[in-house]
């Protein structure tokens, strides 16, 4: 009875009748197959006449001994079949034909992988997050490792803009971590400043979002001419200038304007200009900076509203005053036929839009009303004092009306009669006595 081969009991129940014959590990890939152990040399040396003597009967050609069997050779890593003599050059081949020898389907000597190819494969290998060694070296600010990996990328003709699972390139990570030297190195090596992340933002958007004017300067200086487009919108419809205005980074705004960014560019969703974004963020310094560089103060969004509409509706008094002084049109109508004066809710904003508060802010006194000028004249004050009336409410502080709040028009002064004195009639008929009704003329003496 044939014995069970060694190791068969460890492989589980199998049908020995249908099991193919083969060496252990034959089902594994070539690179994972175990190496063949070298067997010891036989005790008896082989005679010069080998197994080919039967093929060479009657041949006078001397026998060329081949290499011994079971010698460790490179092909042993890939081929598990029987070993045969190898003739590397034609001069070492025998002078007789080798008959009845099977031809191997592939070469027995496989070329070994070059160490440089292994380094390139290791440099471009990704982990479970999609990060390559270049991503990790950039985040760790390892300049030497980045130089080495970039040289391997160049030798292997690989792209520097490799995206991880978050659609971030090594350049994006360098900008996020605020590494201007790393940004300059990557852009010089061929990284594109226009590569988009998962939010549609370029490296320029990210530099403005993270308030990094140094990285923005490195991007704009290292990029080749024509490779940077400052009017690219992200998935929110914002340009890099919109992002810089929203984050309040004035240095980034100045850099973008110096490089030719459109100061009146509108976002795609609402049509707001950078000036309207600055007004809605209540950023007075940013509004003044944009107006100083020529922003259109009357630019309208898709709804027809301007920056003055936004400032008036929100009651932003300093911004309303700045926009009005810069030439904003207070009569401009939006799609609902509303002017900034109509959407304003604050009385002080209304006064600024009507032009009244501008004179009060300059230090000039408001013009007196006709009734107040008549009552404040010396002639009227003498007549009032002769009839027992108070010439001014300042003589009785307890009865004086409260003062007006700053910015509101002054209320006309009223004259009050003393509560203890008897009301005296004025010498001429029809004269007003304070806020009351006109006094009827007194009847003439002797009249019925």
Curated annotation (Swiss-Prot):
Biological processes, Gene Ontology terms: antimicrobial humoral response; canonical NF-kappaB signal transduction; defense response to bacterium; defense response to protozoan; DNA damage response, signal transduction by p53 class mediator; extracellular matrix organization; follicular dendritic cell differentiation; germinal center formation
Low complexity bias: start-end ranges: 377-398, 425-436
Stretches with biased composition (Polar residues): 361-376, 411-423
Listed Gene3D superfamilies: Ankyrin repeat-containing domain
A GO cellular-component term linked to this record: nucleoplasm
One Pfam family matching this protein: Ank_2
Keywords for this protein: Activator, ANK repeat, Cytoplasm, Nucleus, Phosphoprotein, Repeat, Transcription, Transcription regulation, Ubl conjugation
Composition bias, Pro residues: 437-448
ANK-type repeats, residues: 129-161, 166-195, 199-228, 236-265, 270-299, 303-332, 333-362
InterPro entries assigned: Ankyrin_rpt, Ankyrin_rpt-contain_sf, NF-kappa-B_inhibitor
SMART domains cross-referenced by the UniProt entry: ANK
PTM text: Polyubiquitinated. Ubiquitination via 'Lys-63'-linked ubiquitin chains is required for nuclear accumulation. Deubiquitinated by CYLD, which acts on 'Lys-63'-linked ubiquitin chains. Deubiquitination by CYLD prevents nuclear accumulation. Activated by phosphorylation.
Complex and partners: Component of a complex consisting of the NF-kappa-B p52-p52 homodimer and BCL3. Component of a complex consisting of the NF-kappa-B p50-p50 homodimer and BCL3. Interacts with N4BP2, COPS5 and PIR. Interacts with CYLD.
Classification via PANTHER family: NF-KAPPA-B INHIBITOR ALPHA (PTHR46680), NF-KAPPA-B INHIBITOR ZETA (PTHR46680:SF2)
Main function: Contributes to the regulation of transcriptional activation of NF-kappa-B target genes. In the cytoplasm, inhibits the nuclear translocation of the NF-kappa-B p50 subunit. In the nucleus, acts as a transcriptional activator that promotes transcription of NF-kappa-B target genes. Contributes to the regulation of cell proliferation.
Full protein name: B-cell lymphoma 3 protein homolog
Source organism: Mus musculus
């Amino acid at each position: 009875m044939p014995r069970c081969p060694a190791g068969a009991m460890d492989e589980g129940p199998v049908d020995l009748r249908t099991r193919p014959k083969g060496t252990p590990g034959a089902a594994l890939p070539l690179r994972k197959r175990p190496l063949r152990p070298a067997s010891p040399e036989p005790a008896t040396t082989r005679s010069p006449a080998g197994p080919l003597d039967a093929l060479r009967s009657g041949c006078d050609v001397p026998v060329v001994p081949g290499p011994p069997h079971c010698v460790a050779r490179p092909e042993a890593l890939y081929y598990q079949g029987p070993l045969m003599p190898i003739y590397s050059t034609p001069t070492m081949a025998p002078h007789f034909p080798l008959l009845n020898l099977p031809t191997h389907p592939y070469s027995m000597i496989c070329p070994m992988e070059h160490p440089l190819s292994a380094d390139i494969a290791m440099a471009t290998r990704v982990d479970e997050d999609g990060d390559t060694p270049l991503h990790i070296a950039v985040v760790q600010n390892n300049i030497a490792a980045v130089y080495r990996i970039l040289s391997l990328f160049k030798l292997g003709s690989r792209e520097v803009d490799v995206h991880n699972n978050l659609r971030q390139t090594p350049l994006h990570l360098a900008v996020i971590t605020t590494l201007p030297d790393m940004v300059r190195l990557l852009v010089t090596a061929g990284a594109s400043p226009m590569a988009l992340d998962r939010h549609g933002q370029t490296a320029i958007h990210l530099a403005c979002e993270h308030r990094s004017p140094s990285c923005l300067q490195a991007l704009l200086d290292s990029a080749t001419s024509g490779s940077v487009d400052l009017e690219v919108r992200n998935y929110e419809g914002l340009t890099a200038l919109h992002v810089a205005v929203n984050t309040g980074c004035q240095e980034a705004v100045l850099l973008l304007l110096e490089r030719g960014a459109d100061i009146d560019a509108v976002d795609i969703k609402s049509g707001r200009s950078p000036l309207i974004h600055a007004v809605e963020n209540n950023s007075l310094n940013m509004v003044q900076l944009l107006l100083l560089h020529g922003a259109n103060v009357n630019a309208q969004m898709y709804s027809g509203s301007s920056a003055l509409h936004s400032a008036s509706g929100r009651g932003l008094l300093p911004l309303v005053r700045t926009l009005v002084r810069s030439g904003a049109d207070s009569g401009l109508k939006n799609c609902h036929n509303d002017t900034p004066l109509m959407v304003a809710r604050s009385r002080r904003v209304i006064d600024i839009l009507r032009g009244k508060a501008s004179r009060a802010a300059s230090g000039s006194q408001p013009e007196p009303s006709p009734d107040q000028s008549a009552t404040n004249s010396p002639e009227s004050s003498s007549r009032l004092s002769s009839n027992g009336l108070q010439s001014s409410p300042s003589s009785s502080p307890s009865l004086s009306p409260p003062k007006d709040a700053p910015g509101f028009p002054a209320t006309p002064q009223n004259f009050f009669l003393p509560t203890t004195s008897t009301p005296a009639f004025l010498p001429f008929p029809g004269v007003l006595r304070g806020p009351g009704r006109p006094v009827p003329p007194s009847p003439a003496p002797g009249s019925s």
